[in-house]
């Protein structure tokens, strides 16, 4: 079973938001999933990104591969989570 971290679409017509889920790669986009590991809402300003970092880390250690979009979201979330460096 190849586990993938990818987006599952939810919301209404023209107002989508996405669940970040761990699922078998053969399952449909909005089909059943193993675990819900976060939320991504691109319609809000600024974008709403809520991730369960420890669960995502677990799935990556076990061998799950993130989709291109989820990899981009993870990278963006890491940038915003790091504190800004102070200049002396």
Curated annotation (Swiss-Prot):
NCBIfam families: S16. It comes from the Bacteria. SUPFAM superfamilies: Ribosomal protein S16 (SSF54565). One of its GO terms (biological process) is translation. Belongs to the bacterial ribosomal protein bS16 family. Pfam families: Ribosomal_S16. Disulfide bonds: none annotated. GO terms for cellular component: cytoplasm; small ribosomal subunit. GO terms for molecular function: structural constituent of ribosome. The keyword S-adenosyl-L-methionine does not apply. InterPro entries: Ribosomal_bS16, Ribosomal_bS16_dom_sf. Gene3D superfamilies: 3.30.1320.10. Keywords: Ribonucleoprotein, Ribosomal protein. The gene is rpsP. This is Small ribosomal subunit protein bS16. It comes from Anaeromyxobacter sp. (strain Fw109-5).
């Amino acid at each position: 079973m190849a586990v993938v971290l990818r987006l599952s679409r939810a919301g209404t017509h023209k107002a989508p938001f996405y669940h970040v889920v761990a699922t078998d790669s053969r399952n449909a986009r909005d089909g059943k999933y193993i675990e819900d590991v976060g939320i991504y809402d691109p319609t809000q300003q600024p974008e709403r990104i809520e991730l369960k970092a420890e669960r995502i880390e677990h799935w990556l250690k076990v061998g799950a591969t993130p989709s291109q979009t989820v990899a981009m979201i993870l990278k963006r979330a890491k940038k915003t989570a790091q504190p800004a460096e102070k200049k002396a």
